[in-house]
Amino acid sequence: MARGKAKEEGSWKKFIWNSEKKEFLGRTGGSWFKILLFYVIFYGCLAGIFIGTIQVMLLTISEFKPTYQDRVAPPGLTQIPQIQKTEISFRPNDPKSYEEYVRNIVRFLEKYKDSAQKDEMIFEDCGNMPSEIKERGEFNNERGERKVCRFKLEWLGNCSGINDETYGYRDGKPCVLIKLNRVLGFKPKPPKNESLEAYPVMKYSPYVLPVQCTGKRDEDKDRIGNVEYFGLGGYPGFPLQYYPYYGKLLQPKYLQPLLAVQFTNLTMDTEIRIECKAYGENIGYSEKDRFQGRFDVKIEVKS
């Protein structure tokens, strides 16, 4: 039995290294070299084919604009202050209750300060009234970075923070800033004037994508009170000269036009659900995405 075990042990040792034939694991050095060379060439060819395929694919893709945008959803509408539960609840006589909302607005508006828009090589004045879409050439690097329209805080009126650093929260008249999310190459198409007849409070311009905030439910409509809008030229919406957006590579300092909304006499101690909605021929809404073209926010001013 001991002899059989020794014989078995000697056989696997001989398989690992056969000193008589100079073989390692059943192959000579030359055989190992040939098989390793084969696999190096084989996997090298596979890697070359893969890299070549990627290079060909990259030649068809622009780093400045997606080749296909037919499935890109319409832009979303969002509010500032940006809050997790889309609920704003505060007491006007308690600064700590609205401190986070004010800080959120201040932080967002930093890039809209005059001091941040001084560079004449980057920023330009695009007028104090809404105007037509401002084309800035093709989506490529032939002309380098594109200029960006300035947006002045003073256009936000009572919600600019210039005269009221609490943005109305101290007086129980909260401000909410509204922006249309960036979509590369998107050109808003405002609705026709006659299609807005159901919304008589909306000031119309063919060069503005209008926005309106109303009570979400019937009971909310009676409690929302007066709503004031502050935007470029006094229009409640987004002026077209700020579009299209050319992307971070061509417009790294791009400023979205803003609309400020102030609720001046909300019913106290009542949770009011408010819906703000953009209107346009190429603005869509989705039940699956509550921010596509609109948003809801709950506001409660406590006594």
From Swiss-Prot:
<dbReference type="GO" id="GO:0001671">
    <property type="term" value="F:ATPase activator activity"/>
</dbReference>
<protein>
    <recommendedName>
        <fullName>Sodium/potassium-transporting ATPase subunit beta-1</fullName>
    </recommendedName>
</protein>
<keyword id="KW-0735">Signal-anchor</keyword>
<keyword id="KW-0739">Sodium transport</keyword>
<keyword id="KW-0406">Ion transport</keyword>
<feature type="region of interest" description="immunoglobulin-like">
    <location>
        <begin position="191"/>
        <end position="303"/>
    </location>
</feature>
<feature type="topological domain" description="Cytoplasmic">
    <location>
        <begin position="1"/>
        <end position="34"/>
    </location>
</feature>
<keyword id="KW-1133">Transmembrane helix</keyword>
<feature type="glycosylation site" description="N-linked (GlcNAc...) asparagine">
    <location>
        <position position="265"/>
    </location>
</feature>
<keyword id="KW-0813">Transport</keyword>
<dbReference type="GO" id="GO:0045087">
    <property type="term" value="P:innate immune response"/>
</dbReference>
<keyword id="KW-1015">Disulfide bond</keyword>
<dbReference type="GO" id="GO:0030007">
    <property type="term" value="P:intracellular potassium ion homeostasis"/>
</dbReference>
<keyword id="KW-0318">Glutathionylation</keyword>
<dbReference type="InterPro" id="IPR000402">
    <property type="entry name" value="Na/K_ATPase_sub_beta"/>
</dbReference>
<feature type="modified residue" description="Phosphoserine">
    <location>
        <position position="11"/>
    </location>
</feature>
<keyword id="KW-0740">Sodium/potassium transport</keyword>
<keyword id="KW-0630">Potassium</keyword>
<keyword id="KW-0472">Membrane</keyword>
<keyword id="KW-0391">Immunity</keyword>
<feature type="glycosylation site" description="N-linked (GlcNAc...) asparagine">
    <location>
        <position position="193"/>
    </location>
</feature>
<dbReference type="GO" id="GO:0005890">
    <property type="term" value="C:sodium:potassium-exchanging ATPase complex"/>
</dbReference>
<dbReference type="GO" id="GO:0006883">
    <property type="term" value="P:intracellular sodium ion homeostasis"/>
</dbReference>
<comment type="function">
    <text>Involved in cell adhesion and establishing epithelial cell polarity.</text>
</comment>
<feature type="disulfide bond">
    <location>
        <begin position="126"/>
        <end position="149"/>
    </location>
</feature>
<keyword id="KW-0325">Glycoprotein</keyword>
<dbReference type="GO" id="GO:0036376">
    <property type="term" value="P:sodium ion export across plasma membrane"/>
</dbReference>
<keyword id="KW-0130">Cell adhesion</keyword>
<feature type="transmembrane region" description="Helical; Signal-anchor for type II membrane protein">
    <location>
        <begin position="35"/>
        <end position="62"/>
    </location>
</feature>
<keyword id="KW-0915">Sodium</keyword>
<comment type="subunit">
    <text>The sodium/potassium-transporting ATPase is composed of a catalytic alpha subunit, an auxiliary non-catalytic beta subunit and an additional regulatory subunit. Interacts with catalytic subunit ATP12A. Interacts with regulatory subunit FXYD1. Interacts with regulatory subunit FXYD3. Interacts with NKAIN1, NKAIN2 and NKAIN4. Interacts with MLC1. Part of a complex containing MLC1, TRPV4, AQP4 and HEPACAM. Interacts with KIRREL3. Interacts with OBSCN (via protein kinase domain 1). Interacts with TRAF3 and TRAF6.</text>
</comment>
<comment type="function">
    <text>This is the non-catalytic component of the active enzyme, which catalyzes the hydrolysis of ATP coupled with the exchange of Na(+) and K(+) ions across the plasma membrane. The beta subunit regulates, through assembly of alpha/beta heterodimers, the number of sodium pumps transported to the plasma membrane. Plays a role in innate immunity by enhancing virus-triggered induction of interferons (IFNs) and interferon stimulated genes (ISGs). Mechanistically, enhances the ubiquitination of TRAF3 and TRAF6 as well as the phosphorylation of TAK1 and TBK1.</text>
</comment>
<feature type="disulfide bond">
    <location>
        <begin position="159"/>
        <end position="175"/>
    </location>
</feature>
<dbReference type="InterPro" id="IPR038702">
    <property type="entry name" value="Na/K_ATPase_sub_beta_sf"/>
</dbReference>
<dbReference type="GO" id="GO:1990573">
    <property type="term" value="P:potassium ion import across plasma membrane"/>
</dbReference>
<dbReference type="Pfam" id="PF00287">
    <property type="entry name" value="Na_K-ATPase"/>
</dbReference>
<comment type="similarity">
    <text>Belongs to the X(+)/potassium ATPases subunit beta family.</text>
</comment>
<dbReference type="GO" id="GO:0016324">
    <property type="term" value="C:apical plasma membrane"/>
</dbReference>
<dbReference type="GO" id="GO:0042383">
    <property type="term" value="C:sarcolemma"/>
</dbReference>
<feature type="glycosylation site" description="N-linked (GlcNAc...) asparagine">
    <location>
        <position position="158"/>
    </location>
</feature>
<keyword id="KW-0399">Innate immunity</keyword>
<keyword id="KW-0597">Phosphoprotein</keyword>
